[in-house]
């Protein structure tokens, strides 16, 4: 549309769909500002409708098939339309190429139509690769089928009961994650929380309040109701028993209809194989996971060594330290690509509940100093 522009003609933009990648481009043409605005409104409405459609597919996949869609590792479950669109903008900046929500809807629709096992799929990665390889495939369906052809069928999944042993900072964050990942309830299910202190109506409400809001991580996007009559927390409509115990051995989880449970110890009180084995003497337990570095047990950093141990043969695992999880993936990438001869590691850590707010006596010299001013830590749990 090439004509001489004159002073009497107002230059605007014309919204046009470019078929090749379903991207939306703006083309200069003769159009008034009002017409331009109307086109922009129409375009935005189309994109938001696509966002609604994608949210519906994401929910259907998660609650019907236990398939979770993510966008470059960003969770999409419980997101609203604006957040979905914003994540697509972020994804485009991340890969240096527009990521169209129209393509995402097309690919997600194909995934929904296929018979796939429970899994986590990165729709951002799939959409990006489809944009690069679309000339190789006649349509999105052929592309998705080819990319996921190695997906294996799985036996019927058996739900896994989960018990949080400890309900401090880490325990509450774990509770958030577990409840947000419940889905249709055929994978990990949070059934109970163990604390040393007895729970009455007041303490239960305090624990509920701490779960509802975290000073760093903000609001929990769900409902938490204290149920003193049954000594439980009702989280997102699901009963989670609150159990009081001083030692692991004294608990009978089967009394709460909990069996073959995964016990996640986040207390920091039991860190050796001998100490953690005490959980396995409790009736109703099957596996133990430690949220700190453990001695004499496999320390697992996912993405690095998770395949070195058979979970059918090992009952106790450690998730390693925060420092180890932070540095190991980077070190592995450097080691695999270039090789590492030697190195020096420095870690910066937030102060913890064990430190004093003001100077006071402590069994460790530096931890006796005021936490907010003490920038020299005494030790790290980073594994060698």
List the model feature ranges, each with a label:
Residues 7-8, 17-19, 56, 345:
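Generic detection of intrinsically disordered/low-complexity segments and helix-coil linkers/edges
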Residues 9, 13-27:
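Short, positively charged and aromatic/hydrophobic N-terminal segments
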Residues 32-356, 364:
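N-terminal Rossmann-like NAD(P) cofactor-binding subdomain of oxidoreductases
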Residues 5-8, 159-161:
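Exposed boundary/loop context
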Residues 357-384:
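Charged docking surfaces used in two-component/phosphorelay signaling
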């Amino acid at each position: 549309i090439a004509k001489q522009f004159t002073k009497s003609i107002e230059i605007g933009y014309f919204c046009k769909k470019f078929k090749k990648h379903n991207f939306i481009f703006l083309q200069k043409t003769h159009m008034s500002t009002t017409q331009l605005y109307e086109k922009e409104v129409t375009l935005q409405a189309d994109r938001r409708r696509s966002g609604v459609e994608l949210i519906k597919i994401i929910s259907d996949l998660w609650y019907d098939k236990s398939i979770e869609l993510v966008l470059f590792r960003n969770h999409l479950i419980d997101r609203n339309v604006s957040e979905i669109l914003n994540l697509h903008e972020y994804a485009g900046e991340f890969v240096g190429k527009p990521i169209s929500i129209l393509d995402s809807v097309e690919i997600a629709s194909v995934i929904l139509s296929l018979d796939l096992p429970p899994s986590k799929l990165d729709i951002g990665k799939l959409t990006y690769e489809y944009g690069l390889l679309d000339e190789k495939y006649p349509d999105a369906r052929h592309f998705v089928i080819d990319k996921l052809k190695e997906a294996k069928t799985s036996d019927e999944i058996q739900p896994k009961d989960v018990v949080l042993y400890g309900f401090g900072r880490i325990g509450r964050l774990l509770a958030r994650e577990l409840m947000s990942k419940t889905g249709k309830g055929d994978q990990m299910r949070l059934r109970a929380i163990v604390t040393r202190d007895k729970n009455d109506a007041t303490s239960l409400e305090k624990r509920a309040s701490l779960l509802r809001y975290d000073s760093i991580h903000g609001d929990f996007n769900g409902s938490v109701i204290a149920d003193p009559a049954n000594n439980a927390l009702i989280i997102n409509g699901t009963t989670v028993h609150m159990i009081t115990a001083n030692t692991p051995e004294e608990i009978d989880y089967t009394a709460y209809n909990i069996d073959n449970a995964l016990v996640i110890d986040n207390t920091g009180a039991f860190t050796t194989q001998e100490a953690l084995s005490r959980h396995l003497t409790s009736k109703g337990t099957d596996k133990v996971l430690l949220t700190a570095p453990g001695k004499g047990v496999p320390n697992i950093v996912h993405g690095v060594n998770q395949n070195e141990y058979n979970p059918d043969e090992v009952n106790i695992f450690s998730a390693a330290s925060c420092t180890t999880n932070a540095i190991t993936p980077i070190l592995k990438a450097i080691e695999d690509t270039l090789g590492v001869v030697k190195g020096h590691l420095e870690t910066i850590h937030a102060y913890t509940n064990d430190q004093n707010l003001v100077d006071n006596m402590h069994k460790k010299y530096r931890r006796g100093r005021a936490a907010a001013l003490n920038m020299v830590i005494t030790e790290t749990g980073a594994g060698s």
